[in-house]
Amino acid sequence: MLREIRPAIVLLLVLTAITGLAYPLAMTGIAGMLFPAQAQGSLIEKDGKVIGSALIGQEFKDDKYFHGRPSATLAPDPNDSTKTVSAPYNAANSGGSNLGPTSKALADRLKEDVDKLKAENPNAAVPVDLVTTSASGLDPDISPEAAQFQVPRVAKARNMPEEAVKQLVASNVQGRLLGLLGEPRVNVLALNLALDRAAAK
């Protein structure tokens, strides 16, 4: 009997060593050599300290910063382990709200968010990505239109000329991947850091 199952056991051990050890180590090593920043998580530093990643969004509430998309991520309720509480951009619990198009809760939240944004900039149409969550809840980017929509608020909060803030947005727009894939986008953290640098001059 052992003679019959020995080839299967040997094959299992060989494939486990190849796919579970050799391949992952090789890919990690190659990625580290060819794309060191990306292999480490595309981390962003300020004054020698890691403050975030270009791949994971953060919540900005202050009027002097650009805001990202709404996030529906949750965290355990510290007062009741059977419940959850809202925890925007919680990378430990990535996910969407799972609210469907007929959901009253979703419709009410959208209306509230749209009304708030229209009060902030009544002369412009509200970009859809400023009121809709992404599937992961961690989207680090917004559309150029969503960034331009926020220019008046940010410029006023920082006492900067709107044109200067618009130029900052324009200089932080990333194009389509390979000129074909995806849509133009603005990384919110990178834009806010550029804004801080410009304001410090």
From Swiss-Prot:
GO cellular component: plasma membrane
Family: Belongs to the KdpC family.
Transmembrane segment boundaries: 7-27
Gene Ontology molecular function, alphabetical: ATP binding; P-type potassium transmembrane transporter activity
Source species, domain of life: Bacteria
Compartment list: Cell inner membrane
Membrane topology reported for the UniProt record: Single-pass membrane protein
UniProt subunit comment: The system is composed of three essential subunits: KdpA, KdpB and KdpC.
InterPro entries from the UniProt entry: KdpC (IPR003820)
GO biological process: potassium ion transmembrane transport
Function: Part of the high-affinity ATP-driven potassium transport (or Kdp) system, which catalyzes the hydrolysis of ATP coupled with the electrogenic transport of potassium into the cytoplasm. This subunit acts as a catalytic chaperone that increases the ATP-binding affinity of the ATP-hydrolyzing subunit KdpB by the formation of a transient KdpB/KdpC/ATP ternary complex.
Protein name per Swiss-Prot or TrEMBL: Potassium-transporting ATPase KdpC subunit
Main location: membrane
A Pfam family the protein falls into: KdpC
